Amino acid sequence: SPRELESRLIAVHKLHRDGHAILHQPGQLAAYIVVSLPECSMSVDEYRSCLQRAVVKTCEEVQVVASIQPSDPTAVFGRHGVVAEIGIHVDNGVTSFGIFLNVSPRLDEAREIGRGMLGQKVSSLNAERVRPTQMPQVRSALIQHLCEELGYPDYHLHTGHPFLKRTRTLIHDKFANPQSA
């Protein structure tokens, strides 16, 4: 329940999108995609299928077997459970939200929220591969496959900015020790 999650210092936000409750945490790749469906000549269902196919192709690129189940258009499944959630919203033909791909999150927390609360299994690319998956490799592959699926074969991927610097300071990690927060 939302009250139980908040007691564990997990913020709960209600959103206007389809799909299940999703825990956002380190190790998860979130792709918030904004496109005009009329310009892409796509329906909402076609768009969702494009997102699913892009995730499946990304999984294949990192040697993870993934599949789509027609009965559940809001997920991509690995052999051991859901590896990606799809949650979208469309307003005046423009999409928001998108894909939430579990690369290397803590699965114990993920299994207690959303699908986990419904008894469904949750997995990650690392768990499916049984060895580390590099986030930059997954990010590049996902962007490439999204662009291909959405009809944008030409794209440029920039992963840095001269004024942005990565820091190593840990401000707050509620997953490391929930009692100390």
Residue ranges and their predicted role:
Residues 96, 107-181:
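C-terminal accessory segment of soluble enzyme catalytic cores
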Residues 1-78, 82-83, 133, 163-181:
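N-terminal lobe of the biotin/lipoate ligase/transferase fold
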Residues 22-23, 92-94, 117:
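Solvent-exposed alpha-helices and their adjacent loops that cap or buttress functional pockets
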Residues 37-38, 54, 58, 94-96, ...:
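Generic detector of bulky aromatic hydrophobic side chains
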